[in-house]
Curated annotation (Swiss-Prot):
Protein name, as recorded: Type III pantothenate kinase
EC number: 2.7.1.33
Gene for this chain: coaX
Organism: Xanthomonas axonopodis pv. citri (strain 306)
Record's subcellular location: Cytoplasm
Ligand binding (ATP): 7-14, 121
Catalytic reactions on record: (R)-pantothenate + ATP = (R)-4'-phosphopantothenate + ADP + H(+)
GO cellular component: cytoplasm
GO biological process, one term: coenzyme A biosynthetic process
Amino-acid positions noted as binding substrate in the UniProt annotation, renumbered to this chain: 91, 98-101, 171
Annotated cofactor note: A monovalent cation. Ammonium or potassium.
Pathway stated in the Swiss-Prot or TrEMBL entry: Cofactor biosynthesis; coenzyme A biosynthesis; CoA from (R)-pantothenate: step 1/5
Length: 242
């Protein structure tokens, strides 16, 4: 494959070949805040063009770019723009709109009107109208980050473990139920507002490594594991057009 897509998140790294205007088979692994496993870097593919999106720490981003520059003829870095492929971002300063959110909207454009919820280190929510207009969104801590923050302030509260129940009778379940429930409630409230505001039914798309535990609580949601990479494929196609 001569063209590849790379998505470097806050805690996970994904890449896939570019197949037409979609991402091919995705490979992914976790990484540290400032470093990535040397063996993983050595296993990266090579080719003609690497399309790269990153919200990771600058040092890790620069290391990844340098590594890809040794393997690819061109390395193209994605930046959020006010408009792309029929999508118009609501932010007055598009550079402050995260590139992961930008690409997720590009990946979801065929499903609009849609609410896109990304569950990773953060919980991000964005609403996209059928005309391609972004209607804004929200950012909150994801359930995983909520648990880690509670554990950091109160070490007796475990950072993981437990099951979701409506009214828990032990601490582990209470933590899972509270944190997952808070995320689901924010998504549901945002979806209700979007439907009132737009006056039409709004689809719900979720993505991100932290999304699967929330899916049983969001029965109308569609999970798109490769949504950001699909958006990156759309961006790459648009960038290559004359």
């Amino acid at each position: 494959m001569s063209e590849w897509l790379f998505d470097l998140g806050n805690s996970r790294f994904k890449y896939a070949p570019l197949h037409g205007n979609r991402a091919g088979q995705v490979q992914a692994w976790a990484h540290g805040a400032e470093a990535m496993d040397a063996a993983a870097l050595a296993a990266l593919p090579s080719g003609r063009i690497a399309y790269v999106a990153s919200v990771a720490a600058p040092a890790l981003t620069q290391r990844m770019i340098a590594c890809l520059q040794e393997r690819f003829t061109q390395v193209r870095i994605v930046r959020t723009t006010a408009e792309c492929a029929g999508i118009r971002i609501a932010y007055a300063d598009p550079s402050r709109f995260g590139v992961d959110r930008f690409l997720a909207l590009l990946g979801a454009r065929g499903d609009a009107p849609v609410l896109v919820a990304g569950v990773g280190t953060a919980l991000t929510i964005d609403v996209l109208g059928a005309d391609g207009l972004h209607h804004g969104g929200r950012i909150a801590a994801s359930p995983t980050t909520m648990r880690e923050a509670l554990h950091a302030r109160a070490v007796q509260l475990p950072a993981s473990g437990g099951d979701y129940v409506e009214l828990a009778i032990d601490t582990d379940d209470a933590l899972t139920s509270g944190c997952d429930g808070a995320a689901v409630a924010l998504i549901e409230r945002s979806l209700q507002h979007a439907q009132r505001s737009l006056g039409v039914p709004v689809r719900l798309l979720v993505h991100g490594g932290g999304a699967p535990p929330l899916l049983p609580l969001l029965p109308d949601a569609t999970f798109r594991a490769a949504l950001v990479l699909d958006g990156l494929a759309t961006w790459a196609t648009a960038a290559s057009s004359p």
